[in-house]
Amino acid sequence: MAKDVKFGIDARKQMMDGVNVLANAVKVTLGPKGRNVVIDKSFGAPAITKDGVSVAKEIELENKFENMGAQLVREVASKTNDVAGDGTTTATVLAQAILVEGMKSVAAGMNPMDLKRGIDKAVAAAVEEIHNISTPADDSKAIAQVGSISANSDTKIGELIAEAMDKVGKKGVITVEEGSGFEDSLEVVEGMQFDRGYISPYFANKQDSLTAEFENPYILLVDKKISNIREIVPLLEQVMQQSKPLLIIAEDVENEALATLVVNNMRGGLKTCAVKAPGFGDRRKAMLQDIAILTGGTVISEEVGMSLETATIEQLGTAKKVTVGKENTVIVDGAGNKADIEARVESINRQIEESTSDYDKEKLQERVAKLSGGVAVIKVGAATETAMKEKKDRVDDALHATRAAVEEGVVPGGGVALVRALNALADLKGDNEDQNAGINILRRAMEAPLRQIVTNAGDEASVVVNEVKNGSGNYGYNAATGVYGDMLEMGILDPAKVSRSALEHAASVAGLMLTTEAMITDKPQSDDPMAGMGGAGMGGMGGMGGMM
């Protein structure tokens, strides 16, 4: 296929046109008074969003050179979203600002490589300064404030996230789901829950809720099918002497073994309940091992030379309470050793870091949550499906932002942190004049998020930026109310990780684009439907002429 190649100024101009189209669509969403963007969908109602990355993902341009520019800036938003979960619009605004200033310098004859070196030098100094001005986000109030800001000033969402973190821990698993009502709500599942219920409804001992509930039961874990009752009779007799109920978690319990356990249950003998083990294949073995560590038991596995006939009561796990329903099982307060549980969690966390599959990561995180003792579910409520999707996006953003805040602390929000980080660039010098120009490019670009927030609020950007620069510390501008003051006291916080990631990714991609000298794309195919038919048609005519 033939290629279309553009060089130098022509290539950079078309690339910059694409950058501007995408960035101009994304940046209107920035800040508390950011505007909405309406996105047409091929099916259903149009989507309305204030989420920068959602807008960026929708943009595809007809001109291939312009589209390359747009897609490179989209990469800035996506990378920032992947690392910090928020800050996509800030990253896009920064990338555009660096490119606009940088392209002017390149057009004026400066060395693009030196400009990039100057920008990189300035970014390193600014990131260090962001780290220095950050404060830890330890308390619920700070977490709620970060969540509220990221959810476009929705305080209810911030409070729900803070409450969820209180209940399941800052590293606990919090998921976001679409609710059925108009109100947002929080549900917390304590203990380890997995999606397998009783094998037979005859195991249920609470007829009103159709659940089997046991206090201080023994828990037998087996990684094979149990079909012969004689295999487990010795163990059942030992448990019966202790007068405690027994929960059996196995690959399956069937035939004679299941029938005997059910009949025994109904006659009021040994209280038992059989449940299929969660997961499949290797994941099932791993989850059985998780349950064993949580309950202080041992998985009876023939692979390591164990057998059910010789199993003893010491190999059984125990828990304070077990509730088994039709579709799930909850084990609360397992008797496992705390150090063993922490070591297991640490081991799974290492697997998460090494994994390249999003699906595997999600499943591993679920296992961490179950071992850590709880999962919080935020159920989002709204009046319409369109509003529900928009709100769910905002809650997801807020959740990621609060996690980022817990990791690296918080900085004053509203673009103030980047303005304060300019202090680190005041005396910074490059190796030559072109590098100094690169440092100056970043100086101007770091004001861009604050300028855009103010512009979206309908105020005069230059006036506000000068006022904020003349202040110090957390002094900034609350665009929602039009008031100057201490951003931390006003509850306007950004996670330091978000500001850092936005700056690093924007500068990285912008630097690569500034040093671009050629662009290659496929030549457009001819769309004339008759183009390939002329010769064939004429040949046919010739044939007919010969016949006459």
Curated annotation (Swiss-Prot):
Write the protein's name.
Chaperonin GroEL
Q: Where does it localize? A: Cytoplasm
Q: How does it assemble?
A: Forms a cylinder of 14 subunits composed of two heptameric rings stacked back-to-back. Interacts with the co-chaperonin GroES.
What EC identifiers does the entry list? 5.6.1.7
> Upper lineage ranks?
Bacteria, Pseudomonadati, Pseudomonadota, Gammaproteobacteria, Moraxellales
Give coiled-coil spans as residue ranges: none
Q: Provide a Gene Ontology MF annotation, just one.
A: ATP binding
- Annotated catalysed reactions: ATP + H2O + a folded polypeptide = ADP + phosphate + an unfolded polypeptide
